[in-house]
């Protein structure tokens, strides 16, 4: 069992949350949208509403304590890029980031 931070709960992020739940992993889910967070409460270990581009918010989550951080922000490339960069700066062990733009 791994501890996973999942940021972004759109269609792709929710699917990841469902699969990780089936595999028995501990998942902390984060999104700015309260409805999306509420929709996954039954399938994740914990969930928070917040801005993942805010370094203080990410630091408060304890990103260093997660085995894997997944950035599944698909609608805003800049937010995805900033979040990925912040996670690395804050010492995340492993960062996996979704991009709909080939980089």
Identify the function of each model-found stretch.
Residues 9-10:
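Glycine-rich Rossmann-fold phosphate-binding loop(s) that bind the pyrophosphate
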Residues 13:
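N-terminal Rossmann-fold NAD(P) dinucleotide-binding loop
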Residues 20:
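Aromatic pocket-lining residues of Rossmann-like dinucleotide-binding sites
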Residues 28, 96:
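Conserved beta-strand positions in the Rossmann-like core of class I SAM-dependent methyltransferases
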Residues 31:
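Conserved acidic E/D residue at the C-terminus of a beta-strand in Rossmann-like folds
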Residues 37-38:
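Short alpha-helix immediately C-terminal to the canonical SAM-binding loop
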Residues 101-103:
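Conserved small/polar residues in nucleotide/adenosyl-binding loops
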């Amino acid at each position: 069992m791994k501890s996973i931070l999942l940021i972004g709960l759109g269609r792709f992020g929710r699917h990841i949350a469902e699969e990780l739940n089936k595999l028995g992993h501990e998942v902390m889910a984060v999104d700015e949208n309260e409805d999306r967070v509420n929709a996954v409460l039954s399938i994740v270990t914990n969930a928070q509403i917040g801005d993942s581009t805010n370094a203080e918010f990410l630091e408060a989550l304890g990103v260093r304590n997660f085995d894997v951080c997944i950035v599944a922000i698909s609608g805003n490339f800049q937010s995805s890029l900033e979040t990925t960069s912040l996670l690395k700066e804050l010492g995340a062990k492993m960062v996996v980031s979704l991009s709909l733009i080939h980089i």
